[in-house]
């Protein structure tokens, strides 16, 4: 976990569910700082990052069932799936990470996975 010398500086991330059920991760920082922290957390979780684009604010991640922590959530799939995490700064100088299922299937297991992934990221702080 990222630790701080004072209680005032503790990073507090929140996870919200959208109308579609997909999770959104909220960092209390600007886009640049949130980008660094998100990358660190993905590395800590050993998430397979296929590609990243800091200017766009996107991470493309690969999830392979039966491999590590996330295999339990997507156990029926037999191939690697790629998802996009898009980081956007809002007017309050907070940043939101939006989970995008590139297959657009809106599968219930994928929707649940978005919340589980973001909960795991938030637990790193």
Where are these regions (language model features)?
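Ser/Thr-rich, low-complexity intrinsically disordered terminal regions
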Residues: 1-125
């Amino acid at each position: 976990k990222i630790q701080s010398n004072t209680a005032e500086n503790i990073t507090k991330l929140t996870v919200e569910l959208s109308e579609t059920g997909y999770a959104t991760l909220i960092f209390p920082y600007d886009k640049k700082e949130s980008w660094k922290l998100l990358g660190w957390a993905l590395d800590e979780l050993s998430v397979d990052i296929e590609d990243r684009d800091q200017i766009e604010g996107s991470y493309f991640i690969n999830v392979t069932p039966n491999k590590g922590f996330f295999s339990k959530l997507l156990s029926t799939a037999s191939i690697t799936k790629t998802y996009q995490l898009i980081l956007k700064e809002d007017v309050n100088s907070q940043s939101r990470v939006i989970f995008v299922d590139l297959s657009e299937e809106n599968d219930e297991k994928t929707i649940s996975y978005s919340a589980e992934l973001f909960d795991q990221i938030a637990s790193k702080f």
